[in-house]
Amino acid sequence: MPEGPEIRRAADKLVEAVVGKTLTRVWFAFPELKPYEAELVGQQVRQIATRGKALLTYFSNDRVLYSHNQLYGVWRVVNAGESPETKRDLRVRLETQNRAILLYSASDIEMLTPEALTTHPFLQRIGPDVLDLSLTPEQVYERLLLPRFRRRQFSGLLLDQAFLAGLGNYLRVEILWQAQLAPQHTAAQLNEEQLQTLSQALLEIPRLSYNTRGTVDENHHHGAIFSFKVFHRDGESCERCGGIIERTMLSSRPFYWCPHCQR
């Protein structure tokens, strides 16, 4: 599944293609969305934003298209009138005079009003977005120590979107390496210095991944172009201590770490 940085980079491309432009053609695959096709033609795309791994497309008539890529969804930008050859199922087409954005394979798609947006179950459940620049390490520190999070092992907590939105497996792996923490630890077990280091890493690593423009293709959403320290490097030497990086399964996901310096 693509993580927060990949979703935000995809959104950046969509923004460049259609925001501020008038829609000339709208098509939805799902019957419940069909009534909105005619309504949206002639409207402008005002904004495209992300909340964790969800993408929100705002229109000038105050409708908001909610979509979540889940495992297989992917957005593409094409020229107006273009229909790429693909085995994927097209779900959404939003076209302007010159460009079109296409959503393939996703199944979690809804049209919302501003009021419904504030009560949407997924958006209500998720925590602060790690790519929101107003989120500070001090706020993350406080969140780590909340009663519902402070005794949960990091192996599961860092995958829980209710804790911080936008984190995923490669970020979990790299954050814990950066903080020199083993995955079985909890916030309640850490000292002040460890909590501060982890709080910094929880924001620095996702933002580094986003800012260094990771590469994404249809089948591999994990390839950010910054130096992975442990992710997919099992059997190699840890650059920090020289120990051997290991791979295991935690919370049903592959986990990479250096047992020698992550304690």
Swiss-Prot record:
It comes from the Bacteria. Keywords: DNA damage, DNA repair, DNA-binding, Glycosidase, Hydrolase, Lyase, Metal-binding, Multifunctional enzyme, Zinc, Zinc-finger. PROSITE patterns: FPG_CAT, ZF_FPG_1, ZF_FPG_2. DNA binds at Q70, R125, N169. Pfam families: Fapy_DNA_glyco, H2TH, zf-FPG_IleRS. The keyword Metal-binding applies. The active site is at P2 (schiff-base intermediate with dna), E3 (proton donor), K53 (proton donor), R253 (proton donor). Binds 1 zinc ion per subunit. Its EC number is 3.2.2.-, 4.2.99.18. A zinc finger (FPG-type) spans 229-263. Its cofactor is Zn(2+). Gene3D superfamilies: 1.10.8.50, MutM-like, N-terminal. It catalyses: 2'-deoxyribonucleotide-(2'-deoxyribose 5'-phosphate)-2'-deoxyribonucleotide-DNA = a 3'-end 2'-deoxyribonucleotide-(2,3-dehydro-2,3-deoxyribose 5'-phosphate)-DNA + a 5'-end 5'-phospho-2'-deoxyribonucleoside-DNA + H(+). The keyword Protease does not apply. Involved in base excision repair of DNA damaged by oxidation or by mutagenic agents. Acts as a DNA glycosylase that recognizes and removes damaged bases. Has a preference for oxidized pyrimidines, such as thymine glycol, 5,6-dihydrouracil and 5,6-dihydrothymine. Has AP (apurinic/apyrimidinic) lyase activity and introduces nicks in the DNA strand. Cleaves the DNA backbone by beta-delta elimination to generate a single-strand break at the site of the removed base with both 3'- and 5'-phosphates. HAMAP family: Endonuclease_8. This is Endonuclease 8. It comes from Pectobacterium carotovorum subsp. carotovorum (strain PC1). The lineage of its organism: Bacteria, Pseudomonadati, Pseudomonadota, Gammaproteobacteria, Enterobacterales.
